[in-house]
Amino acid sequence: MSKEDLYDEGLDLAFEGKFEDAIERYRRALELDPGYADALHALAMAHAELDDLDAAIDAAKRLCELTPDDILAHTSLSTFYMRKGMVPEAEAESAKARMLDWKRQLSEQKTGGGGA
């Protein structure tokens, strides 16, 4: 099975509320490709759905290291920290996400207004 097939199966299982099974599929996809960001994010979200916030935070931190410019990764990590009561950490990740979004907006303004 390909990493994409495993990821897709995981999404289907998560949609059905079978988060433990989804986690197993995401982990198998990550065994095939440890840098598969979509599977890592889905893994974090599935752990969060089970209220396993330590595992969700661990996966989200790995995702942020893998994709440091991913706004959603930092936003998710911030949310997990907040749910765990780790307010300073949540605020720091939220600030990173806002800064990345501002940079994205500025970049779009620079490239969008010139007409190519």
Predicted regions located by residue number:
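Alpha-helical segment of the N-proximal tetratricopeptide repeat
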Residues: 2-28, 32
